Design a protein with these regions (language model features):
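Acidic, glycine/polar-enriched metal-coordinating patches/loops
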Residues: 635-638
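C-terminal functional modules
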Residues: 43, 364-564
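Catalytic-core regions of glycoside hydrolase
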Residues: 76-79, 104-105, 194, 200-204, ...
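Disordered, acidic Ser/Thr/Pro-rich linker "stalks" and the adjacent N-terminal cap
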Residues: 532, 544-633, 643-646, 650-651
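Short, Φ-rich (hydrophobic/aromatic) sequence segments
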Residues: 12-15, 70-72, 78, 349-360, ...
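Aromatic-lined carbohydrate-binding surfaces of glycoside hydrolases
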Residues: 102-274
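Short boundary motifs at domain starts and secondary-structure transition points
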Residues: 89-95, 263-266, 601
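Contiguous, structured surface segment used for ligand recognition
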Residues: 1-96
Length: 653
């Protein structure tokens, strides 16, 4: 083949010693003659390794690049620098055309260095799509989406486009105009002109996001008109531009109560991709759910999977396997991108699985893939890293009611121990198993910190500190439970106080690190292991104090939510020393007339003020307690006082 892709050839030269020596193993690169539908896909290749030669047949330059990645994975080099390859035939092609990530999370955006490293990672993982849509980029969204990027940011965009191309990744630049767009010819041209500015920076793939908005910008017919205009006047006229992508306002099934999706299906140009998160904002991806939306939008949807994104549980890391993905859904999606965490390096564990799923669904196994991901991301200490990751999987209670399996290798032993502990018995076998686990947890952070990947260590450092303390607390909890079975109360007290000190240290870390405005703190092992330790601590403490029946006011130690609004029922509260409140929702909150929301809290605390922040409310009802005092004809707060608590409920008219 004349002029094979230089990026791919560079990889092959790094792997094999390519020379003009007639005795060297020949390398032959040709175009694929087998034109079955699968091998016509971008990225498809046929790799044949025999004692006589290496044959690579490709569908396109991306296919050669992926074949080169496979050669790197297969090659083994001995101490003398000799490279060996296994003999065989590999016929390889992707199940999904567009595979990768969407940087679409709330919170701190990735750094430029993060993005460069991610693009290199995607190339190695055979992912071909990166959608740039940081929520906090004012030139992607309001207020500056109409304006050009400043010089520094424009130069960074150019760098990203270049790095993406070198790794055979489409850099997709997304615009988010819906917060303040006017459906006028002027603003239509503003979007078109901004696309032109990005084209001049080298961008060849584009998206328009209308997610998480309400009001005028959320009208399906107006959105479709704009997108069809962009399709005709930009996508079809500019050279080398990829298909246009849009994220709709009703991007999940739970919100699809109107004819919005049907309007898009009828009026939107069929060449435009439509994104979809599943049956709710954060949800597993099912074939049934895909077929449901595809009928509405009259095309295969482009999956935006909200995992391992953690902008709704920022005190947790989501380091577990990428499961909950239907292996039979390839035909029902046009693309598959995952929304990662703001911690780019830590996200690689889940993204490793996403890449394998989207490439070959039938062969994908989340559990074995997870083990491989831990080995890939942290080869210096893969077992210690696996221990850390499999105990940092679950987001905890959240408004989306999306939970993940955690500590599954140890959950049975933990429950067996606690079952007997509740009966005032000590299960020595379960204790031994849990002790070994907590010893592994105690040692894991030190092993992990030997990694050369300092960016990863910096991202997860507070959780490593907390994980180490959890291991020590777990060992001490089991020791405390054991001494509590005996007659030596002094020894039990000593062990109990040591455990209390460790839990206090964990609380200090939780209140010191990662103090973001939303879900503050550092949680580890929150589904199985931390509750295990806390239950033992509480149980032994109650026995020591002869206080099994505590005062009702003491039992109510936390504030809680009172509401009939489905979006708020499961939303965690933000609780500090002098305030409690609802955590901010990333999505639009929909409140129907007559619905209410409120709080309940301890009797010993007195409320001095109430603050409402509804910045996007169409009727602009932003109220504080002073509003009620100034407007006596408005309904007063409904007091639902009980002997043990105070609570306030606000009806919404």
């Amino acid at each position: 083949m004349q002029h094979p892709d230089e990026d791919a050839m560079r990889l092959i030269r790094q792997t094999l010693s390519i020379t003009d020596n007639s005795e060297a193993l020949p390398l032959k690169i040709t175009s694929l003659e087998d034109r079955t539908p699968e091998l016509k896909r971008s990225g498809a290749y046929l790799l044949v390794i025999t004692p006589e030669e290496i044959d690579i047949a490709i569908s396109d330059s991306r296919g050669l690049f992926y074949a080169a990645q496979t050669l790197q994975q297969l090659a083994q080099t001995d101490g003398q620098g000799n490279t060996t390859l296994p003999l065989g035939v590999i016929k390889d092609y992707p199940d999904v055309a567009y595979r990768g990530t969407v940087e679409g999370f709330y919170g701190d955006p990735w750094s430029h260095t993060d993005r460069i490293e991610q693009l290199r990672f995607y190339g190695k993982m055979k992912m071909n799509t990166y959608i740039y849509g940081p929520k906090d980029d004012p030139y992607h969204s309001s207020p500056n989406w109409r304006k050009p990027y400043p010089e520094k940011e424009a130069a960074q965009i150019k760098d990203l486009v270049k790095e993406a191309a070198a790794n055979k990744v489409d850099f997709v630049w997304a615009i988010h105009p819906g917060l303040d767009i006017k459906w006028t010819d002027e603003d239509r041209m503003n979007v078109l002109n901004k696309f032109g500015m990005m084209y001049d920076l080298g961008v060849r793939s584009f998206a328009v996001f209308f997610d998480d908005i309400s009001g005028e910008g959320a009208k399906a017919d107006k959105q479709a008109d704009l997108l069809n205009f962009l399709q005709k006047e930009f996508i079809e006229k500019k050279e080398g531009v990829s298909p246009l992508i849009m994220c709709p306002t009703e991007y999940n099934r739970a919100w699809a109560g109107s004819d919005y999706l049907d309007v898009l299906g009828r009026t939107l140009d069929p060449a435009i991709h439509v994104m979809w998160t599943g049956n709710s904002v954060i949800h597993d991806i099912t074939l049934e759910g895909q077929e449901w939306v595809n009928k509405r939008i009259q095309r295969p949807s482009y999956v935006w999977w909200n995992f391992p994104v953690s902008d709704y549980c920022r005190d947790h890391l989501l380091m577990g396997p990428s499961y909950g993905l239907d292996p039979n859904a390839a035909h029902a999606m046009s693309g598959f991108v995952a929304n990662p965490m703001e911690r780019a390096e830590a996200s690689k564990v889940a993204l490793y699985g996403v890449a394998d799923y989207a490439w070959n669904m039938k062969a994908y196994n989340p559990e074995s893939d997870f083990v491989e991901a831990c080995r890939y991301v942290l080869p210096e200490a893969p077992e210690a890293f696996r221990t850390f990751c499999e105990n940092n999987c679950d987001p905890g209670p959240n408004g989306h009611r999306y939970r993940r399996d955690e500590s599954i290798r140890y959950a049975e032993s933990a429950e067996a121990f606690l079952h007997d502990f509740r009966q005032h018995n000590y299960n020595a076998d379960a204790a031994d198993r849990m002790n070994r686990l907590f010893a592994e947890i105690t040692a894991a952070p030190a092993a992990i910190e030997t990694s050369r990947n300092k960016a990863l260590i910096d991202e997860i450092k507070p959780w490593l500190m907390q994980f180490h303390l959890l291991g020590k607390a777990g060992q001490k909890a089991i020791r405390t439970a054991e001494t509590g079975q005996g007659e030596d109360r002094a020894a039990t007290w000593q062990s109990y106080l040591s455990l209390t000190s460790l839990l206090d240290s964990m609380r200090t870390i939780d209140q010191t690190y990662n103090q973001n405005p939303y879900q503050k703190g550092v949680k580890v092992g929150s589904r199985v292991l931390t509750p295990f330790v806390q239950e033992i601590h509480s149980g032994v403490g109650s026995n020591l104090l002869f206080a099994d029946q505590t005062d009702a006011a003491t039992q109510m130690s936390k504030a809680s939510i009172l509401t009939d609004i489905e979006q708020l029922k499961y939303q965690p509260l933000k609780e500090g020393k002098d305030q409690i409140g609802y955590n901010r929702l990333n999505e639009v909150l929909r409140i129907e007339p007559g619905q209410s929301f409120g709080l309940t809290w301890e009797l010993q605390k007195e409320a001095t003020s109430f603050n409402f922040s509804l910045p996007k409310s169409e009727n602009r009802r932003r109220q504080t307690m002073d509003d009620y005092r100034r407007h006596p004809r408005r309904p007063s707060p409904l007091q639902i006082g009980k002997a043990r608590s105070q609570s306030t409920l606000y009806p919404y008219a």
